[in-house]
Each structure stands twice: as structure tokens, then as C-alpha cells.
């Protein structure tokens, strides 16, 4: 009879040990879950950064189109300014902050007329995006923006006419953590 009690007790003890997880198993599960969550957050951060870069390039295209449309009958871009474009209501409201323009990374956008060696005074216009993160700066300078682009550059180097930039040129040009990227569009 005692042996039956001992074996019944042993079975009960084994079953109670098999239920649930040990503290080490719980810690291991939590560590794995933390790694997965961290990975998802990193991927989301990258995706949102890519999205902002795409939006900034779309904003640049909208600005270029708005300026060219407003000045299509003019012989030059004389009188062009950021406030002229803001007041024209030719851009999305999400870009306008008072009398200024903001790009997807929340930096200021400046639009000014400029001169080129082959076009003369006020024959082109500059669009500058301030405070562009380094990785976005590199991506933006390596994009082919079409025939109307005269030259481009970032805050640490002079503008260059050989466009689009190679990755090495963009990396060298966008060496600061936050850069001012300027594009010059000709006629």
C-alpha cells in the first residue's frame, strides 16, 4: 500500500513539475520577443524614412512645376521668391507654414531666382531644402530629375552639373548629419 502511495505521489509530483514554464524559459521567451519587437521597430523606422524621402522628392517636383507654370510667359525668373510661390496657392497646404514652405523632414524650403553662365541673369531658379538628413540627402542627389535640372549640390560642396550624382559623389556632398540640398533648374 505504501508503494502505491509513493508511486501516486511521484506521478503527481511529475505532473506538477511539467506544468508551466521555469523562470529561465520565461526569460528566454521575453528575450526572443524583445529582439523581434526591436527588429520590427528598426524596419518601421527605415520604411518611414524612405517614405519621407519619396514625399520630399514629390514636393520638389510640385515646386518645379508650380514655378515653371507661373513663369511660363516670362523671359526670366526675376521677382521669384518663396513667398510668391506660397501666395500663388499652387502647392499643397501641407507644405505651407505661414509665409514659408516646409519639406517632409520639416526643414525650410527656399526658392530664389539665379543666374547661369549660359542663360544670363535670372535665367534659372534655385530650390533649397534645409535640414535634410544625411541618408535622405544622398538618395535625393542620386535621383535623375530630368532635363530641366541644371545643377545640384549639398551644403558641404559646390554644386555640380554632372547629374545625377554617383553614390560616391552624393556621399561626399552629404557628409554632414543634416544638409542643405540645392537644385538649380534652368529653362
Please state what every model-predicted region is.
Residues 72-187:
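Periplasmic/extracellular, small/polar-rich flexible segments of pilin-like filament-forming proteins
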Residues 16, 43, 127:
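Short, flexible active-site loop motifs that bind/organize anionic cofactors or intermediates
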Residues 31, 35, 72-75:
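Residues in soluble alpha-helical coiled-coils and helical-bundle/repeat scaffolds
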Residues 45-87:
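Membrane-proximal N-terminal amphipathic helix
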Residues 1-19:
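N-terminal leader/signal peptides at the extreme start of proteins
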Residues 24-26, 33-51:
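C-terminal juxtamembrane segment of a hydrophobic transmembrane alpha-helix
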Residues 20-26, 59:
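Residue-level recognition of specific faces of alpha-helices
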Amino acid at each position: 500500500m505504501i508503494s502505491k502511495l509513493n508511486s501516486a505521489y511521484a506521478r503527481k509530483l511529475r505532473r506538477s513539475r511539467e506544468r508551466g514554464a521555469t523562470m529561465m524559459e520565461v526569460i528566454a521567451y521575453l528575450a526572443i520577443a524583445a529582439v523581434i519587437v526591436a527588429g520590427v521597430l528598426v524596419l518601421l523606422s527605415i520604411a518611414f524614412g524612405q517614405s519621407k524621402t519619396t514625399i520630399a522628392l514629390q514636393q520638389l517636383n510640385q515646386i518645379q512645376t508650380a514655378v515653371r507654370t507661373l513663369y511660363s510667359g516670362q523671359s526670366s525668373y526675376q521677382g521669384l521668391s518663396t513667398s510668391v510661390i506660397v501666395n500663388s496657392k499652387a502647392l499643397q497646404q501641407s507644405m505651407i507654414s505661414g509665409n514659408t514652405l516646409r519639406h517632409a523632414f520639416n526643414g525650410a524650403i527656399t526658392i530664389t531666382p539665379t543666374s547661369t553662365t549660359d542663360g544670363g541673369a535670372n535665367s534659372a531658379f534655385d530650390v533649397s531644402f534645409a535640414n535634410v538628413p544625411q541618408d535622405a540627402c544622398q538618395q535625393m542627389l542620386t535621383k535623375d530629375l530630368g532635363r530641366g535640372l541644371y545643377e545640384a549640390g549639398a551644403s558641404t560642396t559646390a554644386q555640380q552639373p554632372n547629374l545625377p550624382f554617383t553614390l560616391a559623389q552624393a556621399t561626399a556632398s552629404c557628409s554632414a548629419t543634416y544638409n542643405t540640398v540645392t537644385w538649380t533648374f534652368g529653362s
